Amino acid sequence: LLNIKDYKGSDLAKFDNIHDVFTVDREWFIDVFKKQPTPTMKIVFAQCESMQPTFTQGDFLLVDTDDTNINDGVYIFKVDDRLFIKRLQIMPGKILVISDNKKYESFNLPSDAVIIAKVIDLWKHDTP
């Protein structure tokens, strides 16, 4: 379980701030995410408000650390030792970083950004 609230600073080695690591039952994983798990899939515990309402604090994000080629989608990336989970949109001559929560401004993805993983699914914390 990767807690991304206080992040400073190929798989788990890409994350500097790991609070807990756990293993989930394969059947549970398939039931919740409707896909077969792979070694590069990780579950991240979201603790941010910048992507509300898409996901909120307490939701679990399924990420793939092998999917680092940028297309339109939600990614975990690092800039200046700071972790972000944001929507990336390819625009002519730039990549736009977008928060789904409109209280946060968009900005251009810096050229030195390091893509850590792509968010490929979500399990809402209030899902039974």
Where are these regions (language model features)?
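Glycine- and charge-enriched low-complexity intrinsically disordered segments
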Residues: M91-P128
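Short, surface-exposed charged micro-motifs
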Residues: R87
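Short, well-ordered loop/turn sites that connect or cap secondary structure elements
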Residues: F55, T68-I70
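Short, positionally conserved secondary-structure boundary motifs
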Residues: L1-Q57, K94, W123-P128
